Design a protein with these regions (language model features):
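N-terminal beta-alpha lobe that positions the nucleotide/phosphoryl donor
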Residues: 1-167, 171-188
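Catalytic cores of soluble metabolic enzymes centered on carboxylation/carboxyl-transfer
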Residues: 192-369
Length: 369
């Protein structure tokens, strides 16, 4: 029941509004008629998003910037939603631009107790897909963390939620306001960064509450250090992320304290185009964010996955950017940076820089053999 109610984005918004959790301004119900669509768009204003009620994970979303685009985009979104999710209901949300994507990890026992285990920063995205995550967020202080906690716990309590779950929010840093985006009623890909900074085994907790464990109220959960996770994907980041397939050769997985690589990589593995491109997760922990960034760069520099292209060089390059090291980014930053790189790709200086990163990665890999 909880999975179904949160999987239906229209119903999820209604539940959160009833629990006084802030939601993005938009329509309360799916749009059924063109005149209803036009009126709603006028009330909300452009730019806006058409969102599939049954969508999620960055799927079933279309941006609209004008009246001329509106009706055709609505029809396409409904058609695609029906094909992808078996549900053609579509609603409208205001497009929140230049915001951070911050999510709150919770665990509920279904018996009145909900734990908040800190936040994760997930703003570095491409095509609504996360690339790098971290905990805690460089944008969240203790006062803001308390606000996220109250919203996440209130939302989960309204469901009498049992299990591990994630409340996702968009945070407008300049206004100091955040809005509920969606709830994932499962463990996220990025859950290890929360485990590393809290010392809590989320998989174990999920099994415990499923077995009937009653959680104590208001536990003293502290955040220690900083953790980063980079998604290693079978894509070529220097050719517009074209999928890369083939056999993995010359695999070398480095080992170091506070570093790990989660995945099923093995020598000779055949990477096909039929599945999600993510191959592994490079995860590190350190006492502070600067050290964690250096540790992630080192881990990626010593990781070798031959035979195919991967996003590893992108991760190394990200760890060297001033804006990343300063924690100064939002959900548009990565795509803007990538676009700037594409436009400057013919610059010999830029090409030399990319070649140097790839060469350094290859050298580090060969030295680790």
């Amino acid at each position: 029941e909880q999975i179904e109610s949160m999987g239906d984005k229209v119903q999820a918004r209604a539940i959160m509004m009833a629990a006084e959790v802030p939601v993005i301004p938009g329509t309360k119900n799916p749009i059924e008629e063109e005149d209803e669509l036009i009126k709603a768009a006028k009330d909300i204003g452009y730019p806006l998003l058409l969102k599939a009620a049954g969508g999620g994970g960055g799927k079933g979303i279309r941006r609209v910037d004008s009246d001329e685009e509106l009706v055709p985009a609505w029809k396409r979104t409904r058609s695609e939603a029906l094909a992808s999710f078996g549900d053609d209901r579509v609603y409208i949300e205001r497009l929140v631009q230049g915001a951070r994507h911050i999510e709150a990890q919770i665990v509920g026992d279904g018996q009145g107790s909900v734990w908040f285990l800190g936040e994760r920063e997930c703003s570095l995205q491409r095509n609504h897909q996360k690339v790098l995550e971290e905990s805690p967020s460089p944008a969240v202080d203790e006062q803001l963390r308390a606000r996220f906690r109250n919203a996440a716990v209130s939302g989960a309590a309204a469901l009498n939620y049992r299990g591990a779950g994630t409340m996702e929010f968009l945070y407008e840093e300049d206004r100091g306001e955040f809005y509920f985006l969606e709830m994932n009623t499962r463990l996220q890909v990025e859950h290890p960064v929360t485990e590393l900074v809290t010392g809590i085994d989320l998989v174990g907790m999920q099994l415990d509450v499923a077995s009937g464990r009653v959680l104590e109220h208001d536990p003293d959960i502290s955040i220690r250090g900083w953790s980063l996770e980079f998604r290693v994907c079978a894509e070529d980041p220097y050719r517009d992320f074209i999928p890369s397939t083939g056999q993995i050769l010359g695999l070398r997985i480095p080992h170091a304290p506070f570093c790990r690589l989660d995945g099923a990589l093995r020598e000779g593995l055949e990477v096909t185009p039929y599945y999600d491109p993510m191959l592994a997760k490079a995860i590190v922990w350190a006492e502070d964010r600067n050290m964690a960034s250096r540790r992630l760069s080192s881990l990626l520099s010593r990781l070798r996955i031959g035979g195919i292209h991967t996003t590893v060089p992108l991760g190394i390059e990200l760890c060297e950017q001033d804006w990343f090291l300063a924690g100064d980014f939002d959900t548009t930053t990565l795509e803007t940076w990538l676009q700037d790189k594409r436009e400057g790709s013919s610059d010999p200086t830029n090409m030399e820089m990319i070649a140097a990163i790839i060469a350094r990665h290859a050298l580090a890999s060969s030295l680790s053999q």
